[in-house]
Amino acid sequence: GSMLRSTWNAGALPFLADPKTTHAWGGAMAIRREVFSQANLEEVWNKAVSDDLTLTMGVRKLGLTLEFVPQCIAVSYESSTLRETLEFTNRQSLISRIYFPPLWWATAIGHACANLLMAYGCASVLIWSATGAAAYLIGSTCLLLLPLQLVNAVWLFSTVKDLLPVQIQTDVQFLRWHYVMTAPLASVMTLVNTVHSAATRQITWRGITYELRSPSETIVVSRID
């Protein structure tokens, strides 16, 4: 669960490096006091469950830009079961859909296309095996996406590693192939997150269930005392 969660998180770094989709990262972000006031973030945060993405949209509305500083990436060590990882990624996906739709759409379209083509490739192989119809072998070429996905993961790992603070690069290098081999699973999980976040507006965090009605309206649905 922890490895999959880490791989899933690492997938956000290319979006951080792209000026069109870059956004504040809750683990390490800074803003000038005067910009904070101009964006009215104190009031916005009183009604939101996301601090980083509301900050992102607030700054963009002022016509200002966000700067991604790789040296400020904060690394945390935490265990996570598969269930906890799924809950976390579902929550983050829904938050991005409500607060930063461009990021959600970019992620949704990319992973949906990749995974649907892979599924089509698998189905083509099964149908060819059952019927012997050679035409389905053409569809099976979609499975070439898997090795391409692994090659991309190798390239992305090297790029991401270079962005991290020097003192932890050795630890990350030790897990190189763990990241690469869990990349396809992280992509499938992202598709699951997309479907889940498209079907609901509720998240549960520390025993409290919230409904995200809009970027400026969040209500408490229930809480476990």
Language model features: what each stretch is:
Residues G1-W8, S37, E42-W104:
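Catalytic donor/gating beta->alpha subdomain of glycosyltransferases that bind UDP-sugars
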Residues G1-E43, L86, N90-S93, Y179-V192, ...:
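Long helical/loop segments within the catalytic core of UDP-sugar-dependent glycosyltransferases
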Residues E217-D225:
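Short, surface-exposed, low-complexity cationic segments
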Residues T107-R201:
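Membrane-embedded multi-pass helical conduit in multi-pass membrane proteins
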